């Protein structure tokens, strides 16, 4: 679960978030589903301070941070935030990388981000064309070059923003092989939970 945090716009109440998570966790556990809490952080100059102070959440209590940027962000700003997070012990996961103009113009920059230690996430809806043919084409380019690390749902509700993970998994498996699909949908996301469990399970 990754509620949005954007300073001055989505300043969530952490206590309320934790209470809601506990209710959802208990209900999901009844059907054998494990839920983990994090947040999608709209990157700003105060990101490391808020993370270290506990005012914002990492992914499942790990050192991974789901980082969102302005769609018009320049590459210098993105590089700078990656370096800052890395220097403070965090691993950034660039959320829905297919949406940013800088990567639309040059997908090769994704490889540069990865070389700095960032992970690249793309949306299931984008992969299967729910966000338009242009975005689907870009995801094809990213996947063909093996520049993505994680495919995630970006689901917001069960109506117009429901999850299409199954369809996306089947598409990736058919186009790029089952090993690639497992890596993007299972293995790499699972690494975040493995790190969490190795450090302190009760914090997850």
Regions found by a protein language model. Give the residues of each.
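Glycine-centered helix-coil hinge/cap
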Residues: 132-135, 177-178
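Short acidic/histidine-rich active-site segments
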Residues: 2, 147-163
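Conserved, mostly hydrophobic/aromatic
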Residues: 3, 96, 154, 189
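Conserved short secondary-structure transition element at the edge of the structured enzyme core
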Residues: 122-124, 139-153
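Extended substrate/RNA-proximal surfaces in nucleic-acid metabolism proteins
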Residues: 10-121, 199-204
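Active-site environment of divalent metal-dependent phosphoester hydrolases
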Residues: 5-9, 42-45, 99-103, 127-130, ...
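Mid-to-C-terminal alpha-helical segments outside catalytic/metal-binding sites
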Residues: 165, 169-204
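Short beta-strand segments at enzyme active-site cores
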Residues: 1-4, 36-38
């Amino acid at each position: 679960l990754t509620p949005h945090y954007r300073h001055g716009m989505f300043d969530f109440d952490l206590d309320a978030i934790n209470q809601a998570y506990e209710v959802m966790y208990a209900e999901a556990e009844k059907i054998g589903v494990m839920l983990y809490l994090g947040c999608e952080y709209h990157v700003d100059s105060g990101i490391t301070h808020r993370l270290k102070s506990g005012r914002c959440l990492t992914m499942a209590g790990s050192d991974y941070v789901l980082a969102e940027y302005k769609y018009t962000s320049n590459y210098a700003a993105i590089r700078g935030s990656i370096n800052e997070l890395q220097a403070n012990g965090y691993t950034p996961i660039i959320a829905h990388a297919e949406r940013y103009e800088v990567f639309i113009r040059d997908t090769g920059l994704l490889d540069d981000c990865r070389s700095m230690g960032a992970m690249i996430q793309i949306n299931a809806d984008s992969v299967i064309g729910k966000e338009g043919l242009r975005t689907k084409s870009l995801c094809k380019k990213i996947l063909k070059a093996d520049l993505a690390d994680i495919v995630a749902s970006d689901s917001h509700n069960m109506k117009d923003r429901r999850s299409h993970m199954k369809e996306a998994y089947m598409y990736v498996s058919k186009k790029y092989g089952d090993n690639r699909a497992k890596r993007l949908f299972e293995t790499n996301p699972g690494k975040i939970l493995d790190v969490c469990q190795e450090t302190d399970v009760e914090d997850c």
